[in-house]
């Protein structure tokens, strides 16, 4: 085991502070509408230019191991806030730096770190409670767009496209971000349920020009197992032929004789039919087939449910107004499922989302939920160069997260003003003498985001903070984009409550951990031994006889 280097007490806290300051100073220049850019070197390709705090934070590694630990802990604040709320990473970094900087001075002056920590925790709890009181739900398309615009660093196109996507697919809908082929940023919305499986044979196509099969007012057979034997299907196909309606078969596989017979009947015009492979694998496939069955009002044909293919009648089949199948995707629009059945299914999936610990499972469950209730929207991000594309795509993803957070927990006035309006909540907090120090640290730290936003815009932070503090209206603040003092909510400068809350909670959590640090342990750097001098290649003589 390699030897370790250990530092204690003040020396440890000073090293942490140096690391925290290095990282925070690089990140905080990006805060606010007039924030500056940071250029990050890449080992290959062009450098990345960004105004996103967490992207800058992730790139920073310091040479000194103890300072690096401080930087990494603040990096954790930024990425945790980004994971939970999608935005507010720079604000969280600024708050963590302010709390730790003030706190380390007071601990050095002899205050008990544990008292200071308790004071910080009580102050944060009071401010979070006040933020929730200040919060208002998002009312309309315009407010959602404003949240998106602010999170996308003032890009109105992105804000409006996100608001439109949210409107089309609803709160539960899935919105994905893709790279577009051209320069334009566009929105595609898929109505109904779509899954990524196409037709099993191109002979099922009804529209040869677009190479897709469109089945209007169709029956849907949902079968869990393979279908290869024709005689199992025959009784059902006779009933379908008599009804004159089209049929779509969704099964694990349709092959051999069964597929050939379906194709022949389709080409003859006896049956209007299309076969599709079931989506997903294993248990997830079963769950998705159940979803399709509930959405279309049919039953999943599975032997474990006591249902055999030869016994199926028309009433076991699902119905849909329209099914469109191309070579890669199947879309079911307007399924005939009962509203209460779909709602019960949605409730079950929501419960599973709450319980699951796997991010991958959660994502898949959310996709299933979206397909049942809303639909899927795809934002295609267009840009002129690859560098711009990377930066723009990251901004769209941030803005999307922030708008979701706003819909979830509501909005508060932006521009760092909401924190100032919560100071009054600290008056009634019961603390002892030692904890009061922690309370005062938070009181000063929550002014820091507004100071930084003003400073980045070229204004004097302290003057701005005092002017905003004097105002009585909650929404009155400083709009750094225009340089005006005004009602920020009306001006569209708003933050999701979840973002403001997470930023403060995460910053205080990590800063108070760092304040109570008494020792740091790191590996000693290995001393590089000098390379031995290179000698000649002895013993190579006498090779003349090899001719």
From Swiss-Prot:
Catalytic activity: ATP + H2O + a folded polypeptide = ADP + phosphate + an unfolded polypeptide
Example of a GO cellular component annotation carried by this entry: cytoplasm
Pfam family, one: Cpn60_TCP1
GO biological process, one term: protein refolding
UniProt-listed CDD domains: GroEL
GO molecular function, one term: unfolded protein binding
Keyword Transport tagged: no
Entry EC no(s): 5.6.1.7
Keywords: ATP-binding, Chaperone, Cytoplasm, Isomerase, Nucleotide-binding
Source domain of life: Bacteria
PROSITE patterns in alphabetical order: CHAPERONINS_CPN60
Protein name: Chaperonin GroEL 2
Native source species: Anaeromyxobacter dehalogenans (strain 2CP-C)
Phylogenetic classification of the source organism: Bacteria, Pseudomonadati, Myxococcota, Myxococcia, Myxococcales
Gene that this polypeptide is encoded by: groEL2
């Amino acid at each position: 085991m390699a030897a370790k280097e250990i530092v204690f007490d003040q020396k440890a806290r000073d090293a942490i502070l140096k690391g925290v300051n290095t990282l925070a100073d690089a990140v905080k220049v990006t805060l606010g509408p007039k924030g500056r850019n940071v250029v990050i070197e890449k080992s290959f390709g062009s450098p990345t230019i960004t105004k996103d705090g967490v992207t800058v934070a992730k790139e920073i590694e310091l040479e000194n191991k103890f300072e690096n630990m401080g930087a990494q802990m603040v990096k954790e604040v930024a990425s945790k806030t980004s994971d939970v709320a999608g935005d507010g990473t720079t604000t969280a970094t600024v708050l963590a730096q302010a709390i730790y900087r003030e706190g380390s001075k007071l601990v050095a002056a002899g205050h008990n770190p544990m008292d200071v920590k308790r004071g910080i925790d009580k102050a944060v709890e009071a401010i979070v409670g006040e933020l929730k009181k200040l919060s208002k739900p998002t009312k309309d398309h315009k407010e959602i767009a404003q949240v998106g615009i602010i999170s996308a660093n003032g890009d109105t196109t992105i804000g409006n496209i996100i608001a439109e996507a949210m409107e089309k697919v609803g709160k539960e809908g899935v919105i994905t971000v893709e790279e577009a082929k051209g320069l334009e940023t566009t929105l595609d919305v898929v109505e109904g349920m779509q899954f990524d499986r196409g037709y099993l044979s191109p002979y099922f196509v009804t529209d040869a020009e677009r190479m897709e099969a469109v089945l209007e007012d169709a029956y849907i057979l949902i079968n869990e197992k393979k279908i290869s034997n024709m005689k199992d299907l025959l009784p059902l196909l006779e009933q379908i032929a008599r009804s004159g309606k089209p049929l779509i078969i969704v099964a694990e596989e349709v092959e051999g004789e069964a597929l050939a017979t379906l194709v022949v009947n389709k080409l003859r015009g006896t049956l209007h039919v299309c076969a599709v492979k079931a989506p997903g694998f294993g248990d997830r496939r079963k769950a998705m087939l159940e979803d399709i069955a509930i959405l279309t009002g049919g039953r999943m044909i599975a032997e474990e449910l006591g249902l055999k293919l030869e016994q199926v009648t028309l009433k076991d089949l699902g119905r849909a107004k329209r099914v469109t199948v191309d070579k890669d995707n199947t879309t079911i629009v307007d399924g005939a499922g009962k509203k209460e059945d779909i709602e019960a299914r949605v409730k079950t999936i929501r419960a599973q989302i709450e319980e699951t610990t796997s991010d991958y499972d959660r994502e898949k469950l959310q996709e299933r939920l979206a397909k049942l209730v809303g639909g899927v929207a795809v934002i295609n991000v267009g840009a002129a160069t690859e560098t711009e594309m990377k930066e723009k795509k990251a901004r769209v993803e941030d803005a999307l997260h922030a708008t979701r957070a706003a819909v979830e927990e509501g909005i508060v006035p932006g521009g760092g003003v909401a924190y100032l309006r919560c100071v009054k909540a600290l008056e009634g907090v019961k603390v002892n003498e030692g904890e009061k120090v922690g309370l005062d640290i938070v009181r000063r730290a929550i002014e820091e985001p507004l100071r930084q936003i003003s400073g980045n815009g070229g204004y004097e932070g302290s003057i701005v903070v005092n002017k905003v503090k004097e105002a009585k209206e909650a929404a009155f603040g400083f709009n750094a984009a225009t340089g005006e003092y005004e009602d920020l909510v009306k001006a569209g400068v708003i933050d999701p409550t979840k973002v403001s809350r997470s930023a403060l909670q995460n910053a205080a959590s990590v800063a108070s951990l760092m304040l109570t640090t008494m020792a740091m342990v790191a590996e000693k750097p290995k001393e590089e031994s000098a390379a031995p001098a290179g000698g000649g290649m002895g013993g190579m003589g006498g090779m003349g006889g090899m001719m």
